[in-house]
């Protein structure tokens, strides 16, 4: 009986705290008594106004909208490195068709790279960003180990319906994209999403890179090079 009372008191305290700090709607959302209203920028790319990164590769350009509101520290890191020329000449060292393309390590081995913060920095998971096809996401070696490496999701097909994905807890709009366009939902809340491809030409370049011949450790046999990255707009 005591355990049940303690649990009830803890829940009541939690509700009271949320009411005092954030209001009744937030408290009800946290208790899942009402559906939380989310801004899902990947579902309305034509309406977004954040900074744009264009990765110029020897296979064409990858144009990406960045999301500083949801991942401020990650976007700031990427923009600063790009403007400093850190990524110039760096290869996509790991390419797996129907999965993703990964780069951002100046050593080209997957073992290097660093952030502007002098050390690895923390994950920035958002309920508003997901690893759908075309998502720009941070590569890592475990929780809170972000540096300079990133990947772009290329998968085009998942063996699940929208209903099955939504049942797993994903927002309806995101579940629909996963079901119809693909992605890597198993990476959500494991890798920080901070951008999204913007146009069809970029998706064609992504698919072309993903189809290159690879050797040991999924490394392309012929280098796929980031020649430079241009940044438009401010975070």
Features from the language model and the residues they span:
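Cyclophilin-like peptidyl-prolyl cis-trans isomerases
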Residues: 36-235
């Amino acid at each position: 009986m005591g355990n049940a009372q303690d649990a009830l008191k803890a829940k009541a305290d939690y509700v009271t705290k949320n009411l005092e700090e954030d209001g009744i709607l937030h408290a009800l959302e946290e208790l899942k008594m009402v559906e939380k209203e989310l801004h899902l920028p990947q579902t309305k790319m034509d309406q977004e106004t954040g900074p744009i990164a264009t990765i110029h590769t020897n296979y064409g350009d990858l144009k990406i909208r960045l999301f500083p509101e949801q991942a401020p520290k990650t976007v700031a890191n990427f923009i600063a490195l790009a403007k400093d020329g850190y990524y110039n000449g760096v290869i996509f060292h790991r390419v797996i068709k129907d999965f993703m393309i990964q780069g951002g390590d100046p050593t080209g081995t997957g073992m290097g790279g660093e952030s502007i913060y002098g050390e690895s920095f923390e994950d920035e998971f958002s309920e508003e960003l997901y690893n759908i096809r075309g998502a720009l996401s941070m590569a890592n070696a475990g929780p809170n180990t972000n540096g300079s490496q990133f990947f772009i999701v290329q998968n085009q097909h998942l063996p699940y319906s929208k209903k099955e994905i939504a049942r797993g807890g994903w927002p309806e709009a995101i579940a629909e994209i996963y079901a119809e366009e693909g992605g890597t939902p198993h990476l959500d809340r494991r890798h920080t999403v901070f951008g999204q491809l913007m146009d069809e030409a970029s998706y064609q370049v992504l698919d072309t890179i993903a189809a290159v011949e690879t050797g040991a450790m999924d490394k392309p046999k012929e280098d796929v090079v980031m020649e430079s990255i241009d940044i438009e707009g401010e975070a």
